[in-house]
């Protein structure tokens, strides 16, 4: 179904995308749930107690698995088919300053409640990375790809549900949870706390950061991490200082992709004060909004501001004027040197800016979960080899050096392969890295450590058995002097 816009509406155009209620499986077939894989709970429905049907104590609910219709003992009374039945909370699409569109609650939402499913195209991680790069090159300003499992992602850029509009917050009131539904993993947005009507929904993206432009976070939380995805491994690897004295990638030098640039009204005034009431009113009157219910999306052509919208706008204005934001905005707007150039989502030619001012992403592999602030001193094997006396010794050290290099390359390429699983595990405590993936990683890490150990023990062994070369006369005299000195000391 095409999500259409009302051409009479004022303000920003509504986004164009295809609205879907279930994940799209064009990339691969939907798995067919085998009968032996269907998990059947032990709930018994009691007509006198409607809560007896698949509630908190249902074995399937406890294991984040939806009951399979036709197999649940509670039959049609089963309450554990929320994804399948699209039992969504009522929400409304609204324009949020600086952050594009967002979703607000239209009703009281209880802590832990299922809000809606994050639907999109199910694609492989390889495809996801490719698409992310293509979108960026084509100037697609918002990112809609999220992790599904170790090997797949959901891309809601072209096809998706309303969940694609939920913005990020470093202090979120929602979270994503993975559920098993009829043999497939599906991602749901759940309330982390009770949410009152008119409150914007937000979860912590903590998403994969693929390199390239970074988006400044405008969530306004006190403990805001500064950038979207700033906690992701990729982002940290790219922005941390890696070598002594090499601060090319330190956080204060990275180019910024600033979503606040999109809307003129979101720019803080020169003196750092918040927008005037007049500006706020203008913002409110030009807002567009959509309302969602469980099974339909209705457009609203009403352009009169409701108290809820005013709240939302006021909230974002406050956000913009917090002390942290003032500092961030001033930095980004005043400094236009190539190193700190603002990468605008609207005006900037992303690929041009990328090639001119973004530092090249280094292929530094994941280093065992630790960011590297202390530079590791590398032994220069070529120099060491020159010191060795025999050809055999040299060959041995060179052979171990080769093995060490291969092990490092293997670990590095493996990291690219399994990074989604590692990050998913770090992000989402309910998931665990598949044993096969963990085993591969441990094996490759051990191989690299062993290769390093073999190399350095070979260096030590061969250096130790290399006779000291005859030295020039000057050195000899100096050493002789030292010997005398030692003897003298001994004599005393
Ligand atoms: C999944 S979309 C969310 C919906 C989006 N606002 C829209 O209009 O379609 C993610 C994008 O929204 C923007 N965004 C979300 N949360 C943000 C935040 N806290 N600060 C700045 N931009 C944000 C970023 O451009 C991000 O790539």
From Swiss-Prot:
GO molecular function, one term: histone H3K4 trimethyltransferase activity
Any one Gene Ontology BP term: flower development
Function (record text): Histone methyltransferase involved in regulation of flowering time. Required for the expression of the SOC1/AGL20 gene. Required for histone H3 trimethylation on 'Lys-4' (H3K4me3) at the SOC1 locus. Prevents trimethylation on 'Lys-27' (H3K27me3) at the same locus.
PANTHER family (alphabetical): SET DOMAIN PROTEINS
Record-listed E.C. numbers: 2.1.1.354
Protein family (similarity comment): Belongs to the class V-like SAM-binding methyltransferase superfamily. Histone-lysine methyltransferase family. SET2 subfamily.
CDD domains: SET_SETD2-like (cd10531)
Catalytic activity: L-lysyl(4)-[histone H3] + 3 S-adenosyl-L-methionine = N(6),N(6),N(6)-trimethyl-L-lysyl(4)-[histone H3] + 3 S-adenosyl-L-homocysteine + 3 H(+)
SMART domains found in the cross-reference section: AWS, PostSET, SET
Organism: Arabidopsis thaliana
Keyword annotations from UniProtKB, A to Z: Centromere, Chromatin regulator, Chromosome, Flowering, Methyltransferase, Nucleus, S-adenosyl-L-methionine, Transferase
Single GO cellular component term: nucleus
Domain (AWS) ranges: 36-87
Primary localization: nucleus
Basic and acidic residues compositional bias, start-end: 277-290, 317-326
Coiled-coil region list: none
Protein name in the entry: Histone-lysine N-methyltransferase ASHH1
Region of interest: Disordered: 259-340
Phenotype caused by lack of the gene: Late flowering.
The SET domain, residue ranges: 84-206
Bias kind Polar residues: ranges: 266-275, 291-306, 328-339
Cellular compartments annotated: Nucleus; Chromosome, Centromere
Post-SET domain segment(s): 213-229
